[in-house]
From Swiss-Prot:
GO terms for biological process: lipid metabolic process. The gene is irs4. Residues 9-32, 69-83, 293-302, 339-348, 469-478, 534-546 have a biased composition (Polar residues). Residues 33-68, 84-95, 373-383, 414-425, 505-517, 573-585, 618-633 have a biased composition (Low complexity). InterPro entries: EF-hand-dom_pair (IPR011992), EH_dom (IPR000261). Coiled coil: none annotated. Residues 1-98, 154-246, 262-652, 671-694, 723-762 are annotated as: Disordered. This is Increased rDNA silencing protein 4. It comes from the Eukaryota. Residues 773-879 form the EH domain. It comes from Botryotinia fuckeliana (strain B05.10) (Noble rot fungus). Positive regulator of phosphatidylinositol 4,5-bisphosphate turnover and negatively regulates signaling through the cell integrity pathway. Involved in rDNA silencing. Residues 156-168 have a biased composition (Gly residues). Keywords: Lipid metabolism.
């Protein structure tokens, strides 16, 4: 299959190795029934945008001539587990058996030529038309038809293998372009590797930086921000130089092939060959910047895409025409209608920043965004896309000239304004290419895109995802990947703010959106942009403004999405704000794209696939000649940082893991609660002790002394001492109990009203002081007796008081009694009752204001009684004095 093809630009032939992954449709759930043969003149090139479920690799080893910088295009998705994206695309089988091998070879050659054209920067590749089946090997691929055939062939099952289970064998094998001079092979995800300029770490295709996510520079991955380019759109790759030359037609054909090959390779292979090394400076896009992630993506995408891709496959001519008609093919940013054969892959330019703020209304494009979760919708969209593609293909057929290739047009953007877009905006719902202001590619006019440069379709990179907001808001200008502006940036696109809202129009069917952005601008038919903030500001430099699709937050992504799927989440989430669709390695944010707060986590990680396409697509978007391969943008760096994080925690975001966590939490809480006491063991609380029957009329007899506090309670448990006093002896306890019994014995059988005067039962002053009380009072007396034994007689002489040693001076008594806080009148009354033995004729004057032991004890007792609430007696009984002495 080695065939030297003259480079459309340089005419030099360089052997290129084209390896195309043959996708085994093991997981390909989508079977596209539409199988048609390409026009005879195009050698029945069948661009089968069939979803390749698995990353089986068909290595079509073919030596193709790439642009003057010799590059080898390796469709090696299998090795680099690119994600196989089942996009509703038309699978077109031209011929059966090995007959398709030639077509595939031709497609590969076309892709190589397209990329080489971008590389050539001067002359777009002009694939030679191949009559009948063009084979890269013995068969020469030439002319735009050759590109078409090449694209067709690329999509045809590897080696002409029929679609898996009749489903499209979509093995968009990654095209890895190896520049021998650059060193290392470059894999091109998108059709955008045209005119790739390698500067520094990143490469610019047509002035647009294509980053597979992380570029290996010096064998080291360099996260570079990619402009999210609409994966589904076949936008004219911008060559490093203006591709305004007449080769644009060829370039469009090559473009179609390249786009097909790149996207398919990207979609089909779960991960790019991890072996890809940055060319030269490491600027070549790494086929598998994140092979592992790509593999996971591929697996998830395979399942989801295949699931979604249910629509019939439109004829290959539709795909080709879509490409050739800048109006149609171009605008589908992610959901390239013709490009992926109704692949509703819509990998929207959602760089898939995991935390993309607003989910881009990816679902809007009818199948434009292929939400991973919404398969049914995708299938319907695919069908719509297929239908739209059919007319597009017809237009393309009618137009032998490669009408301004949607992407070539942007590469050809050298023409200041998009000339009449040849392709009619057939299904141009709201022009999807609203992303780029320059996506104002000239409306596809029935006439062939004569003014190729005019048709920028500056890759309506966002055509896939964000439907162009009619507002001119330059919110997320496509990170204008400086598509190597082929010449003067398209004046019209710059002049007109692409009203296209970032949100992709309802479907890839918005091929019409691919039609000149003018059509999109003029046609406010666009569904109201769901997210205006991403509206593309029309900037003279379309390259500078690429609408960014806000990467859908992972949470929005269906748990089904694996990391690979996450590359598509924006497209999946209808509400995601479009992130700069062409977030190329060095996406230029002329107008700050409204990036979701979280930088695309895995813009490079899981956008490696989508980003490649996006970068290529978006790069084509801007015709401005700014192929600056900027160093990885800040977003790219952040994405790289978060890529690792997302790879770790993303799996936990699935519904299964969440449910498991919930159940685990519930079980843990239930098991942790009082493990020692099982529910059965828990005993009901003991019933409250029965209340004592209260007497209706409580009498004073019911009063009982405070129960004695024993050192040991009845249960033998020692009770805490409340004071420093000695515990009560048994004798004391018995005495107290006896008193209580005596009182209780006096209960009356007949209850009387408490208010009735019962003279006989009235409590009187106790007649005696208990032994306990007496001892306490005597102790206090003993400690204070004998103080101040001297006094002064009337003559002023100091004399000793008789019996002073056994008495307490009145001054000390007053001090002690006042501690009871009783009133002075009460204390005075008590003093009168006890001093000199009361009123019993004692000679108080002889006492000299001192109290003897019994007097002091009785006085303390009276004070205690008064503190207890009892009234002081009128006189102290003899019994009381007797008990005190």
């Amino acid at each position: 299959m080695a065939d030297a093809h003259s480079d459309g630009r340089t005419g030099s032939t360089t052997p290129g190795k084209i390896t195309r992954p043959e996708t085994t449709g093991t997981k390909n759930t989508h079977s596209d029934n539409a199988s048609t043969s390409a026009p005879g003149n195009s050698a029945s090139a069948s661009a089968s945008a069939s979803a390749s479920a698995s990353t089986s690799t068909l290595h079509s080893n073919s030596s193709t001539t790439t642009s003057s910088p010799q590059r080898m295009i390796n469709h090696n998705p299998s090795t680099s587990s690119l994600r196989n994206i089942n996009t509703g695309g038309t699978r077109i089988e031209t011929g059966t058996g090995r007959g398709t091998g030639a077509v595939q070879n031709a497609a590969l050659t076309g892709a190589a030529l397209a990329f080489s054209n971008a590389m050539g920067k001067a002359t777009p590749v002009v694939p030679n038309k191949f009559a009948g089946k063009t084979q890269l090997g013995g068969n020469g691929l030439g002319g735009k038809d050759g590109a078409l055939a090449a694209a067709t062939k690329v999509r045809v099952g590897g080696g002409g293998s029929p679609n898996n289970g009749g489903g499209r064998t979509r093995s968009p094998s990654k095209v890895s372009v190896t520049d021998p001079g650059m060193g290392g092979e470059q894999q091109i995800y998108g059709y955008q590797k045209v005119g790739r300029e390698r500067t520094g770490e990143s490469e610019t295709d047509g002035g647009s930086v294509i980053s597979g996510g992380l570029e290996y520079q010096g064998g080291q991955r360099i996260p570079q921000k990619r402009n999210q380019r609409p994966n589904g759109h076949l936008l004219p790759p911008f060559s490093g130089t203006s591709e305004t030359s007449p080769n644009v037609k060829n370039n469009s054909a090559a473009f179609m092939a390249a786009n097909l090959a790149a996207k398919r390779s990207r979609e089909n292979s779960p991960s790019h060959t991890g072996q890809n090394y940055g060319m030269g400076m490491g600027m070549g896009k790494q086929a598998s910047p994140l092979p592992s992630r790509r593999q996971s993506y591929a697996s998830s995408i395979d399942s989801t895409d295949r699931r979604v891709d249910l629509s019939s496959i439109p004829p290959t001519s539709n795909l080709v025409e879509m490409w050739e008609q800048p109006d149609k093919g171009v605008k589908k940013e992610r959901g390239l209608v013709s490009n992926r054969g109704n692949e509703i892959v819509n990998r929207q330019v959602q760089k898939r920043p995991v935390s993309s703020h607003a989910p881009i209304p990816v679902l809007k494009p009818a199948g434009l965004t292929r939400p991973v979760s919404s398969h049914a919708s995708e299938s319907s969209v695919q069908s719509r896309i297929a239908s739209s593609q059919a007319p597009i293909s017809e237009q393309v057929k009618s137009k032998p000239k490669p009408v301004i290739h949607p992407r070539p047009s942007s590469s050809q953007a050298s023409v200041p304004g998009p000339s009449k877009p040849v392709s009619k905006p057939d299904v141009q719902p709201p022009p999807v290419s609203s992303h780029t202001t320059s996506s104002e590619a000239p409306k596809p006019s029935p006439k062939p895109p004569v003014q190729k440069p005019a048709i920028y379709n500056t890759r309506p990179a966002s055509s896939h995802g964000p439907v162009p907001n009619l507002s001119t808001k330059p919110s997320i200008q496509k990170l204008s990947r400086p598509v190597s502006s082929h010449g003067p940036p398209p004046a019209k696109p710059s002049a007109k703010p692409s009203l296209q809202s970032i949100r992709p129009t309802s479907s890839h069917t918005l091929e019409s959106t691919e039609s000149s952005s003018k059509a999109s601008v003029q046609k406010p038919s666009l569904p109201p942009p769901r997210r205006t903030p991403a509206n593309l500001s029309v900037s003279g430099d379309q390259s500078t403004s690429l609408p960014m699709h806000a990467p859908q937050p992972r949470s929005m992504q269906s748990p089904i999405l694996t990391t690979a799927d996450r590359t598509e989440p924006a497209s999946e989430s209808p509400t995601q704000s479009p992130r700069s669709s062409s977030t190329t390695k060095t996406p230029r944010r002329s107008s700050k794209p409204t990036l979701p707060s979280r930088p695309p986590v895995s813009r490079q990680s899981y956008n490696n696939d989508a980003d490649d396409d996006e970068s290529s697509d978006d790069s084509f978007v801007s015709a401005s000649s700014q192929p600056k391969p900027k160093s990885p943008s800040f977003r790219a760096k952040i994405a790289e940082q978060k890529r690792l994080q997302t790879s770790t925690y993303a799996p936990s975001m699935t519904a299964k893991t969440l449910s498991n966590a919930m159940v685990a939490g519930y079980l843990a809480s239930s098991r942790a609660s009082t493990p020692s006491i099982s529910p059965g063991v828990i005993q009901p609380p003991a019933p409250p002790p029965p209340r004592r029957l209260k007497k209706f009329f409580h009498s004073e007899h019911s009063r009982t002394p405070t129960p004695p506090q024993n050192t040991l309670s009845a249960t033998g448990v020692p009770t805490m001492k409340t004071t420093m006093r000695k515990p009560k002896t048994e004798k004391e306890l018995k005495e107290e109990e006896g008193e209580g019994e005596k009182r209780r014995a006096k209960k009356h059988l007949v209850k009387k009203h408490p208010n009735k005067h019962d003279e006989g039962n009235r409590k009187r002053w106790r007649d005696e002081i208990t032994e306990k009380e007496r001892k306490r009072y005597e102790a206090l007396w003993a400690s204070n007796k004998g103080l101040f034994p001297y006094t002064m007689d009337p003559r002023g002489e100091i004399i000793e008081i008789e019996g002073a040693a056994d008495t307490v001076p009145g001054m000390v008594v007053k001090d002690l009694w006042e501690r009871s806080r009783l009133g002075g009148d009460v204390l005075e009354e008590v003093w009168e009752l006890v001093h000199g033995k009361g009123y019993w004729g004692r000679q108080k004057q002889k006492r000299f204001g001192r109290l003897e032991r019994d007097e002091f004890v009785v006085g303390l007792w009276l004070i205690d009684q008064r503190l207890k609430g009892r009234k002081l007696p009128a006189r102290v009984n003899h019994s009381l004095w007797a008990s005190a002495s």
